[in-house]
Amino acid sequence: MKIRPIKVLSIVMYLLTTSLSLADDVNYLREAISNTAESIVEGRAGDTDDMLEYLQNARDYAISAQEKYKNKQIKIAVYHINWAINHADENNLSSAMKDAGLALLHLKYMIR
């Protein structure tokens, strides 16, 4: 069986483009997770209005990552962020911080 250089080159190019797009996806996911975690931490440090704004930003980042990757940990983090927003909206900051912390915990598993 004769191996043609063009065939080998096309396979190598396919593998390179696939690995590059995978690297872009990984970078996007890391950035989305980092932005989500940063928004949660900033929200936990502020007052109720700031917390709501940062948690809503965190939810937006997490939802965009969830839509792209369909990952269970991100889905659970979105769930906890939604609960944190509900608690912050009711001025129950301790419960909001607890749920924000749980969201961070689930996002931590994604960073590994």
Label every PLM stretch briefly:
Residues M1-D24:
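Classic N-terminal secretory signal peptides
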Residues L20-R112:
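Long, charged/polar, soluble alpha-helical segments
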